[in-house]
Structures are given as C-alpha cells and as structure tokens.
Amino acid sequence: MTPLQQLAATIEARKGADPASSWTAKLLSKGPEKCAEKFGEEAVEAIIEAVKGDRDALTSEAADALYHLLVMCAARDVSLSDIEAELESRHGTSGLTEKANR
C-alpha cells in the first residue's frame, strides 16, 4: 500500500469517528463545504511556496494539500480509488484531446 493509499484508508476510517478524537473526524463532521474551504486554503499555501521557490516548504504544503483534497473528496464519498480510475481512463490520451471531449 502506498503512503497515499494509507492516508486515504485512514481518512475513510475516521469518517465515523468521534470528532473529539481526531482532526480528520472533526473536519469531516463540519461537512463538505468546510472541507472544501480548508483544501482551498492549503492549495493557496502550496501555490505561494511554488512561486517563492522554496522546495522544502512546497513539499510540505503539497502534502497538506493532498491530505485536504482527500478529506474533501471523502466528504462527498469520492474515494482515492475513484480518482485513480479516472486518471487511468485518461492515461494515453492527449490532455488536449481529453479536455476537448469533456
């Protein structure tokens, strides 16, 4: 199991947990809108570090953004497997072709 798969499994396991017991459970208990807001904040922080050129800070913020992306998706019952399947369906297709087919 990859670290991303392990993270997704942990997030899934926290869906029904007591919000007082974990940050993930607390965030999920606040609903998809709050999860989306938090993902947006983390994505902006990653963008800032990318612009600044700080590789270590970007790596850290990218990890935070990936975590919050998975939490946001879990809040809407979209799993990492769903995302992987979507990526697999696009594999081998030009990005321009894929975009035109949407």
UniProtKB/Swiss-Prot annotation:
What is one term from the GO cellular component aspect held by the record? cytoplasm
Q: Which CDD domains match?
A: NTP-PPase_HisIE_like
Name any one GO molecular function.
ATP binding
Q: Which keywords does this Swiss-Prot/TrEMBL entry list?
A: Amino-acid biosynthesis, ATP-binding, Cytoplasm, Histidine biosynthesis, Hydrolase, Nucleotide-binding
Location in the cell reads: Cytoplasm
Assign the protein's first listed, main location to one coarse class: cytoplasm
Which pathway is it part of?
Amino-acid biosynthesis; L-histidine biosynthesis; L-histidine from 5-phospho-alpha-D-ribose 1-diphosphate: step 2/9
Recorded hits in SUPFAM superfamilies, A to Z, give:
all-alpha NTP pyrophosphatases
Query: Has the keyword Zinc been applied to this entry?
Result: no
Pfam families in the record: PRA-PH (PF01503)
**What span is annotated as the signal peptide, if there is one?**
none
| Enzyme Commission numbers on file | 3.6.1.31
How would you classify this enzyme at the top EC level?
Answer: hydrolase
Matching entries from InterPro entries are given as:
HisE, PRib-ATP_PPHydrolase-like
User: Which GO biological-process labels does this protein carry?
Assistant: L-histidine biosynthetic process
Q: Does the keyword Lipid metabolism apply?
A: no
- The superkingdom listed in its UniProt entry is Bacteria
Catalyses: 1-(5-phospho-beta-D-ribosyl)-ATP + H2O = 1-(5-phospho-beta-D-ribosyl)-5'-AMP + diphosphate + H(+)
HAMAP family linked to this entry:
HisE
Q: Which family does it belong to?
A: Belongs to the PRA-PH family.
Q: What is this protein called?
A: Phosphoribosyl-ATP pyrophosphatase
Q: Which organism is it from?
A: Jannaschia sp. (strain CCS1)
